[in-house]
């Protein structure tokens, strides 16, 4: 037995030494195939690209771009916008002459730029550069200008081309195909004049700042400001604006306020004031804006009434180049050419800026089926969120005011279009004043008594037609007070209308309180029924004789005894003639007789409120409430038939004129504004004003 065991063990040992033992599969388990080791394929990573740019490893950046040349990355905005990786050897690369042009002719000094690829949108291509600080730029060869897209690559991939004006223009041209575009020759001339103007304004500003730029540190800058107090240094933009050098004592900035400014910064560096901005006129958006400079040379702006600083540029020379353009989100760099000492005296004072810098607005319009249900606006999630932010109450004493929630919501949903109950196909595009570029002074709104008593005001958007971007100069502005009241300011009329005392009233009525909508020109019966919902068939004949009082009275006499349904809500019936007035009592007969001596003529009766309706000597429509109490309902008989008894639903004053106006300005209809043609033109715009000699507005 022992020998046999020894033989078996020896055989086993010899077999184990010659070949490895095979692992037998366990019962119930299949044998797994052996996997081969393989290398994971490398893919393009935005973090690796950003890391190379931050470390300024330009040799590694060049190799990385060459390795992943042709890779595509979708940008954050707009949709279908692609970033294509590529370097100096890519087929769409710039020439050396173009690269030197971008490095020398845009910033007033040489700035090293490294090409990292191109951005493709529609049929356009934009070369993308990164500088030594990590900022990303895009070059528009058609207009010969640079756009600063973001301060780093992470912001570039998140924001995309939202700072590039040609992309906004192409999107607006696609949304509004009927709007005529600027002729290419005229546009080229505007760009040439803009480049010449930018160079002249930059040379003047550089000449004014040359001594301050020579200061090497903060102590030297403080000494220069102290020695040159009240000196005015011209800015490149805005025009006719300058930086007035002032110390902290002159500006009223205490040490605690400077520390508060310092805590609002990301790096929390010490800051020193340089001065404040003054313009040619006091009514300017940039008046009293304070300019501060940090120890690292970064220039900040302190807006009026705010405790946070806004970063303008990384150094003082950059501030001389851009001015206050970043406050309106203008990141465009014009080609100003090379600048040296001999060119500082080339500034031509006759050069003017040909067109105003402004931010383009892009709206987001949902389909009509998702906005309306049986002709009425849906109470969508955007409306619901606006209501919650509008009616927010403070549950705790230390929580911020409700207006902060409303402002945050409006900024988060900027560009969304919400339909109004009336007029048809009209709505409000949400956004704050910075989004639309509204730069009016608050004194403009404080001229109205209703806004003086409203407390704090919050801007929530502009009124526009469906699929049309509003114009900030003419579109009605919607404001909300701290008490929850809704107001509409019409710049063309310079009037304020009270739309509602709550969110529910604003949502139910829309712009029905804006009387100028009811003085539009007559189009046809279908439009009259869709807009105003009255049953008067002779509206066309009535529109031809609005300012002829004798013919108006003749029309009322011809329709004596006929009943019509007035527009608006609540539903009321109007009877032409004066037959029902004869049945009034003796007191009312006496009042009516006195009014007739004052050239007030009875033209009919309103039911079911049972009130007599009068026409004054100028064609205005009044209603007799009780005793000698008269309320003016409309400027013309046409406006009265269209708007109807809306005042009886909300018996209060709707329209307010400025307190400093010496004479009452005629209320022009909204249709008199010059606007491009749209697909819904039969509902909206016409080109002729119908009120030439009328004073006041409805229910004023």
UniProtKB/Swiss-Prot annotation:
It comes from the Viruses. Residues 9-21 have a biased composition (Low complexity). GO terms for cellular component: host cell cytoplasm; host cell nucleus; virion component. Its main location: virion. The keyword Membrane does not apply. InterPro entries: US22-like. It is found in: Virion; Host nucleus; Host cytoplasm. Signal peptide: none annotated. Keywords: Early protein, Host cytoplasm, Host nucleus, Virion. Pfam families: US22 (PF02393). Residues 1-30 are annotated as: Disordered. Belongs to the herpesviridae US22 family. Interacts with UL38 and host HDAC1; these interactions are necessary for the HDAC1 interaction with UL38. Interacts with host MTA2. Contributes to activation of immediate-early gene expression. This is Protein UL29/28. It comes from Human cytomegalovirus (strain Merlin) (HHV-5).
